[in-house]
From Swiss-Prot:
Residues 106-124, 142-152 have a biased composition (Basic and acidic residues). This is Uncharacterized protein ZK353.4. Residues 207-217, 274-290 have a biased composition (Low complexity). Residues 89-157, 172-217, 261-290 are annotated as: Disordered. It comes from the Eukaryota. Residues 172-183, 193-202 have a biased composition (Polar residues). It comes from Caenorhabditis elegans.
Length: 290
């Protein structure tokens, strides 16, 4: 009875289920569903395992980097200290070796110099020294300069005025045109003869004929005019720089009449003794303004 009850109970259960033995389509559906469930479980398990492995690798990398940083922090000061110590040792070695190297260099230099000297002494001197020929120097023509002393302000005040000089210059031009047609004016400058007592006491000195004599002459008057004309030129130049127009005077016209032009050659007066007479040739200007 019990077995029948048990059998009936199983059969009743099977009857209650929607799947029956006579429906194969239901069985295929159930199998497909079970396969999908198994596949899903396998994939999820695999993904979980991969995730765990990646986390483990990350943790290992983090641990390794942390250990490397700790090692670097410990090694850096040690490396710095070691490098400093090695540098100091190398510098000390170089300092110790430097005097020896300099001595070796000096010794090598001296040996090279000695060998060069020995070779030069052994070799005979074949080249004969050529006789030195004196080079002739260019002869410069000796010219005697005309010396003229600039008169002081006191002498200028004593001398004649510019109008007198102008009159004398015009007279000179007239006499030269009438008397001497060759273009030269002969002027005699006579120096006073000193007494015997003065001549015995003072030694003779060379004296140029253009120096001022005891008496007034045309040469001294012209020298005074040249000094005054230079002063007037300086004053005119200063006035032009200041922006003012210099006054026109008769000094320019007199300079054209009294002073020879640049085209005429200069005259050379030879040095003479105090007790001699000299003749000075002064060429007149090309155009004389009256």
């Amino acid at each position: 009875m019990l077995e029948d009850k048990g059998e009936l109970s199983i059969k009743e259960v099977l009857k209650c289920l929607p799947i029956s033995e006579k429906s194969p389509a239901n069985w295929a559906a159930w199998c497909f569903g079970l396969i999908l469930v198994v596949l899903i479980l396998i994939v999820t398990g695999y993904m979980f395992v991969v995730y765990l492995r990646s986390q483990r690798k990350k943790n290992q990398l983090a641990d390794e980097t942390g250990g490397i940083e700790i090692e670097n922090s410990i090694r850096d000061p040690v490396v710095i200290n070691n490098s400093l110590a090695s540098r100091s040792c190398s510098e000390n070695k170089v300092k110790k070796q430097s005097p020896e190297s300099t001595e070796q260099d000096d010794f090598s230099k001296t040996t090279v110099d000695e060998t060069i000297k020995e070779k030069s002494e052994k070799q005979p001197k074949t080249c004969a020294q050529k006789p030195k020929v004196p080079i002739p120097k260019a002869s410069t023509p000796k010219t005697e300069k005309l010396v003229s002393k600039e008169p002081s302000t006191e002498e200028l005040s004593v001398k004649n005025s510019l109008t007198d000089l102008k009159n004398e210059a015009t007279k000179m031009a007239n006499t030269s045109s009438s008397a001497n047609r060759t273009g030269e004016i002969s002027v005699e400058i006579v120096s006073p003869k000193p007494t015997t007592a003065v001549q015995a006491s003072t030694p003779e000195k060379p004296m140029s004929s253009a120096e001022s004599a005891m008496e007034s002459s045309i040469g001294s008057d012209i020298s005074t005019y040249i000094v005054s004309s230079k002063r007037s030129e300086v004053n005119n130049y200063n006035m032009i720089e200041a922006g003012r127009t210099p006054p026109m005077s008769f000094s320019e016209s007199y300079a054209q009449t009294a002073i020879p032009t640049a085209n005429t050659p200069p005259t050379v007066v030879h040095v003479s003794k105090p007790s001699s007479e000299t003749s000075v040739s002064i060429p007149p200007s090309s155009a004389v303004k009256k």
